Structures are given as structure tokens and as C-alpha cells.
Amino acid sequence: TTLFLGGMALTHGGEPYLLYNSPTKQRIMINLTYILNKMKVASMAMLLPIIACSCSMMHEDMGECKQELRLKFKYDKNMKFADAFSSQVKTLSLHAYNKNGEMVFDKTEAVSDIEAAGGYITLDIRPCVYSLQVWAEGETVYDGSYKYSTKGKAEDGIENLDCKINRDGRKVDHDLNALYHGMMGNVDLRMDDYGVKTFTMPLTKNTNNIKVVIQNASGKKLKASDFSFEIDDDNSWLDCYNDNIKEDSITYRPWSQYDGIVGAEESETQVSAVVAEMTVNRLFANKNPRLKVYNNENGKLVFNIPLVDYALLVKGNYNKDMTDQDYLDRQDEYSFVFFVDDGMNWLSASIFVNSWRVVLQNVDM
């Protein structure tokens, strides 16, 4: 009789043992069952570390053995309707508040670091219902452009996350960093199972570049010193919802003002012009900021126009279904071309807004 347990059949005289030794068949089958059960237990014992290791790897790589909340960001509320978050936003401050109004998460990070980490911020908070708020800035053109009320007590409430243009007096005559805002109120971050849950917060760009061009069509040479430019508004102080926290009057003055010639080609008529550039905070469709230009020679007002009304004159030319506020939030560059005669009087028959010619009627001076 020969007995092999290493995967070979049991034999008796060269033939299968179980066929020729029936009296012991039941006993041998019991022994085989016992051996197979032992082998099964041993195999399971060997698999346990592998399973544990696999779960560990999923925990680290796939997040299947834990709960992880990730927040991504996008800035596609622009006239190109394309996400420009990574290229235009440079720094970001994120705040999370629970239903009791307590700050439970606060993080400021460079967008380059966010992109390097996968394009998201991991929220180290328990999955629940939270309100999330963001203030963000673009490239630094003026250090300390804004003051943020974000470092108070955790129980102060999300309403205290306001932002104000940093200034000493009423006037601002320098450029401003691009300012962005994001808000998601009472967002449900709860999870039913382990794994990763990703949310995306859209951002709105608040700041706008206003370029004002004064041209003399008759050929008289204009100098930058001939005019003074300003925009009066009350939008310097915004709350956590991106609305006016209160009327806070501000006057924007040019951070760049120069003269030059329009139409440099020989085939074109050369026209003298003065250009002024200003950066203003968020424009509101229900507000009435005024763009004013003065003749410095005699101090007289050349014109005083409602900036928002004139900005909206060409909204329909973009063939997009937008409310007035949506257009003002998407458009961040406005170019206005005005014409004056030799006496520096405004020729108000027509103007150009963002290269669109507009024929004016019932001009509001």
C-alpha cells in the first residue's frame, strides 16, 4: 500500500486504494476530509495578511477603506465659458462652518500646490452638512490689496468673513489684485459608505479693468494731463455672500494714464487720444456707479455717465442668455471710447464699448 498526500492519489498494489479496499474506504475518506479542512484553514491564515495589506493599499491609494472629502474649484464664469482656475487664481482661503455657525476648517493655500496635489483640497472634517466659503486672489500687482475678517473666533459665524479694499482714504489710485469669491451654503457632505466624495465650488471674479479712451477726431493733439478720470461707487466692502456689506463710498482713480496716437498705419487717419485704466471691485446691476471725466484746463465736467448702464449696452451682442448681473460677473474688461471736439466737449452721438459702436439716445449726463 502506498499513501501520498502531496497531490498524488492513494494506491494499493498500483491501483487506486479506494477502489480495492472498500472496508477502509470510509476511514480514508474521513482522513482526507480532515486533511483538506486543515489545508483550508492554513490557506485562509495565509490570505489574511494579503487581505489586510490590500485594504491598506486601498486606504492609501483608492480611499476605499476610509471616508475622504475633496473639494475642487473652477472659474468658468467668464466670457469664454471655460475653466481658467489654475491659470488665473493664485492663492485661495477656504473656510467651512457647521450648522451651529462654528468654523471647523480654515486653510489658505497656493493654487500651484493645490494643482500639484491633484487639483483639490482634502477636508479634514467629519462628513456632515457645512457651509463653505472662499476668498481668492490672482497675480499680485499690489501687495495687501484687501483686508479680510477671517481670523476671528471660530464661533463668530460665517457672516463675519467679509473683504474690504485696503485703503487709507476715500480714493484708490493703484491697481488691485484680481479678487475671487465662492460660496456653497448648507452643502450635504454626508457619505453612506467608505470611499472618496468630491465636490466642486464655482468662483466668481469680482474685479474689473476699466479702460477709458478720449479721442479728438479733428486732429488736435491731446495730452494725458488734459483730463482727470474717476469712478464713484460704494462697492469696496463685500460680505461672505459677495454682496455689499454696507454703502462704503469709494473713488477709483487711474493707475495708468497716458497719451498716444490711434491709427499708426499710413493708410489710416491718425487721431490723438488719452487713455486711462482703472480697476474696480464687483459691479452690481442694481447700483449706480458714475464714470466722470474732467477738463483739467478749466475744471469743467466733460461727462458724468452711469457706468453699469453703459457697460450693459453691448450685452446682447454676445448672443448669450445672461441676466444683467451674470454678464457683469462674467465680463471683467471694459473698454470705452469717447470723442471730444477741439473745445474738449463730448460728442455724444456715439461711443464704442468693447469695440462695439453704440449710437446713443437720451444721453444721461
Q: Model regions: which residues?
A:
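Sec-dependent bacterial lipoprotein signal peptides
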Residues: T1-T2, L19-C53
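Bacterial Sec-dependent N-terminal signal peptides
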Residues: I30, P49-N78, V359
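Tryptophan-paired
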Residues: L92-Y146, L222-Y318
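Short, low-hydrophobicity acidic/polar segments
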Residues: F105-K205
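A sequence/structural signal for flexible, mid-protein segments enriched
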Residues: R170-E268
